[in-house]
Amino acid sequence: MSIESSSSESSPNADALHLNSSEVRVLGCLIEKQATNPETYPLTLNALVLACNQKTSRDPVMSLTPGQVGQSLRALEGRGLTRLVMGSRADRWEHRVDKAVELVPAQVILTGLLLLRGPQTVSELLTRSHRMHDFEDSEQLIHQLERLIARGLAMLAPRQSGQREDRYTHLLGDPDDLQELLAARQHAPERNAANPAASQRFDELEARVAALEERLARLE
């Protein structure tokens, strides 16, 4: 299945959102930190660089420079997806995805997770979203994913060889980058297929490590 032909409904918003990998990472981080660390949001450039380069809760792990992050912010600002907030001590950045693309909070959170971690199963999204949005159950989460798909902002990814569960991915990035991610996942082990409980514990521990990394970064 072609990524570009996956949506049954054309979305003018989606057509304008062909982001490069750095822009995808920056936008995903702003969405995540608004939900998990509202006391430090909007983010300074330095805080955003740290968020982009986290070793946990990121796939792939990246090493972006302040210059790359700043350039991505300005490009996103030009699309109406970010905004600079002037401050007395430091300038900060916030995302505008909810307004620019007209998404409800649940859809914003799911979009952020897909931007940060690529193709994911419903169970993975349910576990990883628990600190950011209270989905009642998997059916409610699937309903919001289907609304994103109808807008041309996400898709049900083709199931790869050896995978038992369907995966969803965003459609905001470059189609070639998304195809590359899907190809890489074809050779990756399906972690939660054999032991879902262990997979959930792993994701919870990963979230705790990410929170500790953020605290340490603020102390430095």
UniProtKB/Swiss-Prot annotation:
Signal peptide: none
Entry-linked SUPFAM superfamilies: Winged helix' DNA-binding domain (SSF46785)
InterPro entries, A to Z: DUF480 (IPR007432), WH-like_DNA-bd_sf (IPR036388), WH_DNA-bd_sf (IPR036390)
PANTHER family, alphabetized: UPF0502 PROTEIN YCEH (PTHR38768:SF1)
Family: Belongs to the UPF0502 family.
Protein name: UPF0502 protein PSPPH_2577
